[in-house]
Structures are given as C-alpha cells and as structure tokens.
Amino acid sequence: MAKTIQAIRGMNDCAPTESPLWQWIEAQVRNVLNSYGYSEVRMPIVESTPLFARAIGEVTDVVSKEMYTFWDNDEQLTLRPEGTAGCVRAAIEHGWIYNNEQRLWYIGPMFRHERPQKGRYRQFHQVGVEVFGIANPEIDAELIMLTYRLWKALGIDQHVTLQLNSIGSLEARANYRSALVGFLENHQDLMSDEEKERLVRNPLRILDTKNPELQKVLDNAPKLLDYLDDESRTHFEQLCSLLDAVGIQYEINPKLVRGLDYYNKTVFEWVTSALGAQGTVCGGGRYDGLVEQLGGHATPSIGFAMGLERLVLLVQEVNPNVPAKSAVDIYVVYQGEGATLAAFELAEKVRSELPHLNTMLHCSSGNFKKQFKRADKSGATLALVIGESEVQNKQVVVKHLQGGTDQQTLDLVNIIDYLQTQF
C-alpha cells in the first residue's frame, strides 16, 4: 500500500460533520452584514510581497517572521496573511473609493507561519470589514454595534467583552514612543531577547507582552491616552458617548495597540475568557493613512477582522445546542423492479418543487435495512420509500426517522402537499 499523504501542519480539513456549524455561522455573518448595507468583495489569496511590507510594516512579526513568500520568475509573491492590505489595493486599483464612500466585507483563508495551537493555525479563515471615506466616529460606533449584533445572533454576546483604546496620530504616537522607551530602558533585565529587540524596533508591541513580570511593570508605564492629540481625543470621547447611548459596555485598555503598523486613532478588540490564552475573537481600528501610503488619495478608513476558527470554538463552548441544520432533510430509498426510475423521478420532483429542502437519493446497493441505516446516519427527518408495490400502485411510503408518527402510505400525486406540512 502506498504511503498516505497528510495535511500540512497547521492547515486543517473541515469534516462533513463540522461543516453545518461553519455554514450556520457564515450565514449569520452574511445576514448581519447585508442588513447593514455592506457589499461583499473577493480578492486573490496571493499578492505582491511589497504590498504587505508597505502596509503592515517591515518590523512587524507578521512581515518579518510569519509570511509564506516565494518567487515567481522575478516577482516576489506572498500568501495573504490578512485581508485589509489586499482590499485597499483592490479599491485603489479599480477606483472603488475615488470620491466615494464604500462599506465592504470579505471572507476567506489567510496564511501565517506560526506555531499551531488551539485557535491559531497556519491557514485560517477570516471575515473582514472595511469602510472607506468616512472620518466621523459614528462609523467606528457602527462597526462595533454591527459586531455586537452578530454576537447576539450567534448566542455568544454574554461571553465577549469589548476593549477600546485610541493610539492617536503618528505624531502623538512618536511622542509616546519616546516616553515609553525611556521608561522601559530601566527594566531591560526583565525582558527576553525578543522583547529587547521590540524595544528598539517596535516598542509599542511590548504593551501586549505575555511576560507576567513585565506586565506588572507596565501598570506604571506612561499611558498612551495621556499623549493624544486633541483631534484623536475628541474622536475617542465621541465614540465612547455613542456606545454609552446605545448601551454597549466596554473597557478602556491603555495597553491595546494591535499588531499592525497601519492603525491610528480608534483600536478595539472583542475578547473572551472561554477560550483560554487565545482570547481575541475580533479586532480592528482606524487606518486613515493606509490608502495614501499605498498610492491612493488620502482616504479615512476603518475596519476589523474576525477569525472563523475561533468563532466556531467559542460557539461550541458556550452555545453547544446551536440549531445547526442537518445536511439532509429527505432520504429516498428504493428496491425492486422499476423502483430505481421511480425513485429518481420522485427525488427530482421534490427538488424542483421544494428547493429549500435537501433531498438525498440512496444511489447504492443494499436491502431496505441497510438503506434505512444509511438514512438514519444522514440525519434526515423523513425517508421516502419506493418498492415494487409502490411502483405498481403509484404510491410512496413516508417513514419518520426522528420519531413522531408511524410510517404511512400516500399517493404520489399528494406527496408534495404532504411534505409542505412537515417542513
């Protein structure tokens, strides 16, 4: 026997038993985003490497350590590690945002070469939302309200907490960076080699360190909110007022900076304690300078991304009885002379007249006992049974597989009307 080939570490398959929950979550996402008037876009999973270096920042962990990059002739390409840069590239290239507001969303796989662990994979799936052309804090609040509405739809709203911060303008961050470095230089004895490197290259990233001793020291560090420019402070205060007005609770986290260099002003995360160390389920913020940085006109922008794998884990943890619909509603079994053709005709009739139902035809050998066993395994609600006598009498037997009434025999001409009463 030939040696089997396994999936790449950190890149996982989704089994038939798992996909109904994924589909249900994705359906809730689509429903909420569509209800807010957002439009779906689709971008390639491969982009030019310089796009991410310019957008995310060359000193970030994502660009310096985690990207899957390769050469195609003389062009360096990368599997996308996140979606914002590609969406901005597409918006500039196709003129979607020239003198225009856009509210966009996308869904798809992303890739990062990280150490796989629960909730963190090398191929993972994200829903991303990007808004272009609106500078007011009202849109910041709308995105947060949108995510909260999604949490309610998923039944997880009591298990997530909103954390907010403002990281201000580039100038304000530069002033804060100097103060933070001055403070941290006296505590390098507590730092790992990686943290010492961050102190030089990207000191704000030390704020989300997992080092417990350094976390205690940071409680007394300068606060970014104390260095905000007036515009950023006013923007943040207005955002908080809007959230207060609609009753969305939040915590101001002065250590929240996000991991990508393009953010400014508002940053936010939805976190949970139900998943252990990997507690962030959604994060985003404003990136008002990114469009211009990538060659477009100056355009105020804001967005967020949420990881579907973590949403799946969270829903399974706190809402295990989620009504994930079975992939099959009706299972058609048949045996005997003439039954095959009759079963095919019946299955197609049901599919044509009741397209909202999922109908599976057995299409395999086996007696009725084996076919019913397969029907039970499919999760179907009903089995439609055709044997030789049913063919001769133009009838069909209906068997309830999930309890309920006993089986009954109906004329074929009445089967559609009957099924409409059952679903």
Curated annotation (Swiss-Prot):
Catalytic activities: tRNA(His) + L-histidine + ATP = L-histidyl-tRNA(His) + AMP + diphosphate + H(+)
**GO MF entries:** ATP binding; histidine-tRNA ligase activity
- From which domain of life does this come? Bacteria
EC number(s) reported in the record: 6.1.1.21
Q: Where in the cell is it found?
A: Cytoplasm
Q: Show the CDD domains listed in the entry.
A: HisRS-like_core, HisRS_anticodon
Q: Does the keyword Translocase apply?
A: no
Judged by the first EC level, this protein's enzyme class is ligase
| Record InterPro entries | aa-tRNA-synth_II (IPR006195), aa-tRNA-synth_II/BPL/LPL (IPR045864), Anticodon-bd (IPR004154), Anticodon-bd_dom_sf (IPR036621), His-tRNA-ligase (IPR015807), HisRS-like_core (IPR041715), HisRS/HisZ (IPR004516), HisRS_anticodon (IPR033656)
Any Gene Ontology biological process: histidyl-tRNA aminoacylation
Keyword terms of this UniProt record = Aminoacyl-tRNA synthetase, ATP-binding, Cytoplasm, Ligase, Nucleotide-binding, Protein biosynthesis
Q: Name one GO cellular component term.
A: cytoplasm
**Pfam families for this protein:** HGTP_anticodon, tRNA-synt_His
Q: Which family does it belong to?
A: Belongs to the class-II aminoacyl-tRNA synthetase family.
Report quaternary structure and partners: Homodimer.
* Protein name as catalogued: Histidine--tRNA ligase
Instruction: Give the species this sequence originates from.
Output: Haemophilus influenzae (strain ATCC 51907 / DSM 11121 / KW20 / Rd)
Q: Mind giving the lineage of the organism this protein is from? A: Bacteria, Pseudomonadati, Pseudomonadota, Gammaproteobacteria, Pasteurellales
